[in-house]
Amino acid sequence: MAKINVLLLCGGGGAEHDISLMSARFFETSLAKSDQFSVLTLTLDKQGRYHTQDGNLCSLTNRREIRFEDPSIAPWAVDYVIPCIHGFPGETGDIQSYFNLIQLPYFGCESEASSNCFNKITAKMWFSALGVPNTPYIFLHQFDQEAIAQTQAAFDTWGSVFIKAASQGSSVGCYKVDVRDNIAKVLEEAFGYAPYVVVEKTIKARELEVAVYEYQGDIIATLPGEIICDTNKFYSFDEKYAKDSKARTDVVASNLSPKLCLQIQDYAIKAFKGMKLRHLSRIDFFLTQDDEILLNEINTFPGLTPISMFPKMLQNHGHDFTEYLSDVISQQLGR
């Protein structure tokens, strides 16, 4: 049987460019363990240009093939795409829209689901509509005195807030505010990352994560894992990826009752189904001291770096990542 030509896209040129490259290496290693696939890895730069690993410029055409600027290199037919791009344009749904247009099968959530989850305001509206509890919030559409006043009122009610750019990933443009006088400055910074901002009540809680994915026709939700940070810190971009980070992860969270685990898994699957996610996701929750469960956010293309939770939780659940990938791709292509 002929091999499946898999195009692995990474980079994107945004704040998570380097993280995307690390995740792509995990895909390369996993795909190499199977003789089903022939893989071409391309990096997308800030200018929207694709590069091979040798530095050759190329493009993905509407004929579903890669054409190289060097005319001596023959076009490469594409059967399937893995858009391993964190943030824009991968998790925002933009690149998936192009794949839909040229009828090219791809791994991961479709464009509408990706967009709905990436925008924190839209996502929270969906959570509430689906009956999944989430953190109290307000949202703002421009930086002005009214926005400052609304945020100050929320701060006065809640005592502490998170101010988040509505359409960024990996805690980019996300700030914890404990001092009222800092609100205006932080709001201005957040609006520098996105045209909309969400202000959330700070929740003192455990940070739990669930890998939710499709395998052999079933939707799987793993046992919750846990992110453990220093006291009074949140899981910022630096805490995630800095070499001197004090944060640690537990693939299976300790001291959770079976009832709580089941409730968290039920909410995760409810969100996965209700928002019409596909193939994979990492769904993050808060668990308060009173055992209140709050959905924090959904990551439609979770990181696959050495510290990332998704592949560890999948493996802990008893599934091999290469076999999982092969199953998803084969089911989609009908092979």
Swiss-Prot record:
Enzyme Commission number, as recorded: 6.3.2.4
Cofactor annotation remark: Binds 2 magnesium or manganese ions per subunit.
Cofactor: Mg(2+); Mn(2+)
UniProt signal peptide: none
Pathway listed: Cell wall biogenesis; peptidoglycan biosynthesis
PROSITE patterns noted in UniProt: ATP_GRASP, DALA_DALA_LIGASE_1, DALA_DALA_LIGASE_2
Binding sites annotated in the UniProt record for Mg(2+) 1: 284, 297
Glycoprotein is among the record's keywords: no
Record has Transmembrane as a keyword: no
Residue numbers binding Mg(2+) 2: 297, 299
Subcellular location: Cytoplasm
Pfam families to which the protein is assigned, alphabetical: Dala_Dala_lig_C (PF07478), Dala_Dala_lig_N (PF01820)
Family: Belongs to the D-alanine--D-alanine ligase family.
Name of the protein described by the UniProt record: D-alanine--D-alanine ligase
Organism: Shewanella denitrificans (strain OS217 / ATCC BAA-1090 / DSM 15013)
Organism taxonomic ancestry: Bacteria, Pseudomonadati, Pseudomonadota, Gammaproteobacteria, Alteromonadales
Gene giving rise to this polypeptide: ddl
